[in-house]
Amino acid sequence: MKAAVLVFPGSNCDRDLAVGFRSAGFEVEMVWHKETALPAGIDVVGIPGGFSYGDYLRCGAIAAQSPIMRAVADFAGQGGHVLGVCNGFQVLCETRLLPGVLMRNGGIKFVCRAEPLVVASATSPFTDGYSIGDRIAVPVAHHDGNYQIDDEGLSALRSEDRIAFTYADNPNGSRADIAGVLSANRRVLGMMPHPERAVDVAHGGTDGSVLFASLAAALVAA
């Protein structure tokens, strides 16, 4: 199995995300934002956290226009798996690979702590190692993690079981406590919390490792 982890100017969690993938047995290749194609044989693309392009204009807005994101959009359109974490979630929303927007936190403060999440959907390659209702601890670190979506979009997410994770104690004002959402084909996941920071007991817990292991198992079984 092979993962491509994108690197933008201002990314600072790309190596962390690579560690997350490697913990589940993935070979990882780092891909610079100016590349126009993904490496051959890629099974999943990871879009990391950080402050791509300094978060100018809007978080993820400039990164969404980078050459490599055209290749990622094509990859996703062909049924490829994509995981966007924190700034990566913002990029996925800016490219319209996922619905909704990420806005400034409701408290207008940067939030950085382990956050309790509730697994809302266990029927995706990323989440089928969990059970619905599981409470897991995953770190958050963001200033613009307030997920918003209109009534029609929220209704669609709910009816199609596309809300992957919710916050047990909403830290940022996200509508419906949403912490992560899935694409219609369930192969693109965007989430503000950092599962790659919860794959080692020495770092405080391993609840995030289930996500990477779930994806690995799904790819092996495919």
From Swiss-Prot:
Its EC number is 6.3.5.3, 3.5.1.2. InterPro entries: Class_I_gatase-like, PRibForGlyAmidine_synth_PurQ. GO terms for biological process: 'de novo' IMP biosynthetic process. Its main location: cytoplasm. PROSITE patterns: GATASE_TYPE_1. Keywords: ATP-binding, Cytoplasm, Glutamine amidotransferase, Hydrolase, Ligase, Nucleotide-binding, Purine biosynthesis. It comes from the Bacteria. GO terms for molecular function: ATP binding; glutaminase activity; phosphoribosylformylglycinamidine synthase activity. Pfam families: GATase_5 (PF13507). One of its GO terms (cellular component) is cytoplasm. Residues 3-222 form the Glutamine amidotransferase type-1 domain. HAMAP family: PurQ (MF_00421). This is Phosphoribosylformylglycinamidine synthase subunit PurQ.
